[in-house]
Amino acid sequence: MQNRVVSCRFTGSTARRATMPEGIRGRSHILFLVPLSRAESVGRLHQVQRFKVNLPVFVGSVAVIALFVGIGVIAPKRAESIFSGMQTAILSGFGWLYLLSVAVFLFSMLFLAFSRYGELKLGPDDSEPEFRYLSWIAMLFAAGMGIGLMYFAVGEPMTHFASPPEAEPLTIAAQREAMSVTFFHWGVHAWAIYSVVGLSLAYFGYRYNLPLTVRSGLYPLLKEGIHGPIGHVVDIFAICGTMFGLATSLGFGILQINSGLNYLLGIPQSIYVQLLLVTVVTAIATISVVTGVEKGVRILSETNLFLAVLLMLFVLVVGPTGTLMRDFVQNIGLYLDSLVLRTFNIYAYEPRPWIDSWTLFYWAWWISWSPFVGMFIARISRGRTVREFVTAVLFVPAMFTFLWMTVFGNTAIYVDTTIANGELARDVKADLSVALFQFFEYLPWPAVTSTLAVLLVSIFFVTSSDSGSLVIDTIASGGETATPALQRIFWCSLSGIVAAVLLSTGGLTALQSATISTALPFSLVMLILVWSLFVGMRADLARTQSPGSLGPRAYPASGVPWQRRLAMTLSTPDRRAVEKFLQASVLPALEAVARELTRRSRPASVGRDAETGALTLTVPAEGHRDFVYGVQMSEHKLPAFTAYDATVADVRYEARTFFSDGSRGYDIMGMADNQIINDVLFQFERYTGFVRSPESSLLATSPEER
């Protein structure tokens, strides 16, 4: 059953209501008419601003957010006690499930990356990445880990050094264990958690043409049921978890910024300063979110990565450089040596509260944070292969994090043991939020480095806020990415308002505990996502391994002389030649096939896209993807093999095919009419086998490209 668009026109106190069919399944659209000023409204009543939302998800998530914020405002202490108790009970009672789940996530992602599934594209077979590799890495890094690295770079290694889980405190063994544990908490396990959600959303969103929402990962289990109540609940859960994570991180981060400004400039640590900081950060994030991923988020992420590298290199150069590089190599060895043991070590035979306070807390936090980071990574990863996605997401940020933690953590331990005589360890224990600034006091130019650190923390918060708001907006709109600016402003502002309200009432800790508690049910959802990925990819491989999936078969069957084929390959047709070919050869061939199919009781039609000029033969199929054989003009850069090549046109225009199942297209420029018909028939035979095969039925029955 389709949803409807609700259009409301407000004129004075009256309102007129109308409805029309909406063609996008599972999505409700609301049209708001925004009044202009009195002077502007002469001759024009209103300016239309369209809000695109999935109504049950939008209303449900806003209601749940309001409920939890209300509890935090009305009874912050009572709420903190209840949610903290819930968090403690979950971590102690189900910690084994967290460890086991994260192990499954990691090994599943590695298997998908390095098996035959790794060759699948996140999108059609010939899709290309939307962002440069460096921009892509910068954005996923800033969204996934950024602010935590600033907060824990000095604090966590120093804390484990002073109070390690097993070694004697403040010893060489404690140094080794401190860095090994820190690497473990910030290494590939965290990114494996993010990868599960990100890969699931990207794969089913771009490969199965489903909405870019968490519910789509449940498609192999629920099929069309993802558009019903269960799907709504999953998306509401994801929105609320993301909003609460954003709000608590923003609130605690503002406290750190305020501490830094107090440490540097003597600015008082007060609620008024903190509310002002929330306003400034939210305003900058709003500007960024309005400009979108391609501009605001990308530019801020790249700037942040550049400044972070600059700060890290400064500490590396002025610190014990040679020692740090040796430490880096040793730390990686310690990490790899203990990787499997720590993955499954819950201290079952010698219970330690340390595991609940650190490892299990981290796993729960990464899981609760994964809808946000996973969705954002999915949104920017179209066109990547599964192998490229997993290896980049797992290893590139982790390796940078390892170097970062070594530079700051080992330098801090070195300073504490050789210069500060234990003073830095005591300062960190007293106040973790100013540990980084106190660390800079032992290095040259502390004012400059501390100022840069405050700037980095601020930008990290902006990038988290704007990317998080984009993610929430995408889920609330049913997977729509091209939403109105006002809609994105709403979500970005709401995260700032929630943080400000809870800062004022002292409810941040309660909300953080509630957020971490949600990791338990969501870990079960994530296990289903892993299963869904294997089921979906198995159906996909059945399609790609069917005959004809790799290219055209008309040439070998048509007896074209090899000399002519070589001449066609080396030719460089211009735009006019391709347009003429489409009109004179492709169109008659497609029309001939359509007539014959219709005569044989298989209705078919040929259409032309008004904007691109693409020609499409479509054969409808009830309950399956339609058969589509399309041909469109595409432009390709030519390599120069000789000096002569460099003097002629460096662009080649092709008549390239495309298909409804996302198979890779190919150039048919120069084929005769009967050769084109042979190619269409071959692809139709392949399509028939595709929709009839039980192995590929899941993909064959998924929606058409949106």
Swiss-Prot record:
<feature type="topological domain" description="Cytoplasmic">
    <location>
        <begin position="292"/>
        <end position="304"/>
    </location>
</feature>
<feature type="transmembrane region" description="Helical">
    <location>
        <begin position="236"/>
        <end position="256"/>
    </location>
</feature>
<keyword id="KW-0029">Amino-acid transport</keyword>
<protein>
    <recommendedName>
        <fullName>Glycine betaine/proline betaine transporter BetS</fullName>
    </recommendedName>
</protein>
<feature type="topological domain" description="Cytoplasmic">
    <location>
        <begin position="115"/>
        <end position="133"/>
    </location>
</feature>
<dbReference type="Pfam" id="PF02028">
    <property type="entry name" value="BCCT"/>
</dbReference>
<keyword id="KW-0614">Plasmid</keyword>
<keyword id="KW-0739">Sodium transport</keyword>
<keyword id="KW-0346">Stress response</keyword>
<dbReference type="InterPro" id="IPR018093">
    <property type="entry name" value="BCCT_CS"/>
</dbReference>
<feature type="transmembrane region" description="Helical">
    <location>
        <begin position="389"/>
        <end position="409"/>
    </location>
</feature>
<feature type="transmembrane region" description="Helical">
    <location>
        <begin position="489"/>
        <end position="509"/>
    </location>
</feature>
<dbReference type="GO" id="GO:0006814">
    <property type="term" value="P:sodium ion transport"/>
</dbReference>
<dbReference type="GO" id="GO:0005886">
    <property type="term" value="C:plasma membrane"/>
</dbReference>
<feature type="transmembrane region" description="Helical">
    <location>
        <begin position="305"/>
        <end position="325"/>
    </location>
</feature>
<feature type="transmembrane region" description="Helical">
    <location>
        <begin position="358"/>
        <end position="378"/>
    </location>
</feature>
<keyword id="KW-1133">Transmembrane helix</keyword>
<comment type="similarity">
    <text>Belongs to the BCCT transporter (TC 2.A.15) family.</text>
</comment>
<feature type="topological domain" description="Periplasmic">
    <location>
        <begin position="76"/>
        <end position="93"/>
    </location>
</feature>
<keyword id="KW-1003">Cell membrane</keyword>
<feature type="transmembrane region" description="Helical">
    <location>
        <begin position="442"/>
        <end position="462"/>
    </location>
</feature>
<dbReference type="GO" id="GO:0022857">
    <property type="term" value="F:transmembrane transporter activity"/>
</dbReference>
<feature type="topological domain" description="Cytoplasmic">
    <location>
        <begin position="537"/>
        <end position="706"/>
    </location>
</feature>
<feature type="topological domain" description="Periplasmic">
    <location>
        <begin position="326"/>
        <end position="357"/>
    </location>
</feature>
<feature type="transmembrane region" description="Helical">
    <location>
        <begin position="134"/>
        <end position="154"/>
    </location>
</feature>
<keyword id="KW-0997">Cell inner membrane</keyword>
<keyword id="KW-0813">Transport</keyword>
<feature type="topological domain" description="Periplasmic">
    <location>
        <begin position="155"/>
        <end position="180"/>
    </location>
</feature>
<feature type="topological domain" description="Cytoplasmic">
    <location>
        <begin position="202"/>
        <end position="235"/>
    </location>
</feature>
<keyword id="KW-0406">Ion transport</keyword>
<feature type="topological domain" description="Cytoplasmic">
    <location>
        <begin position="463"/>
        <end position="488"/>
    </location>
</feature>
<dbReference type="InterPro" id="IPR000060">
    <property type="entry name" value="BCCT_transptr"/>
</dbReference>
<keyword id="KW-0812">Transmembrane</keyword>
<keyword id="KW-0915">Sodium</keyword>
<feature type="topological domain" description="Periplasmic">
    <location>
        <begin position="510"/>
        <end position="515"/>
    </location>
</feature>
<feature type="transmembrane region" description="Helical">
    <location>
        <begin position="181"/>
        <end position="201"/>
    </location>
</feature>
<keyword id="KW-0472">Membrane</keyword>
<dbReference type="GO" id="GO:0006865">
    <property type="term" value="P:amino acid transport"/>
</dbReference>
<feature type="topological domain" description="Periplasmic">
    <location>
        <begin position="257"/>
        <end position="270"/>
    </location>
</feature>
<comment type="function">
    <text>High-affinity Na(+)-coupled glycine betaine and proline betaine transport. Required for a rapid adaptation to osmotic stress. Does not transport other trimethylammonium or related molecules, such as choline, carnitine and ectoine.</text>
</comment>
<feature type="transmembrane region" description="Helical">
    <location>
        <begin position="55"/>
        <end position="75"/>
    </location>
</feature>
<feature type="topological domain" description="Cytoplasmic">
    <location>
        <begin position="1"/>
        <end position="54"/>
    </location>
</feature>
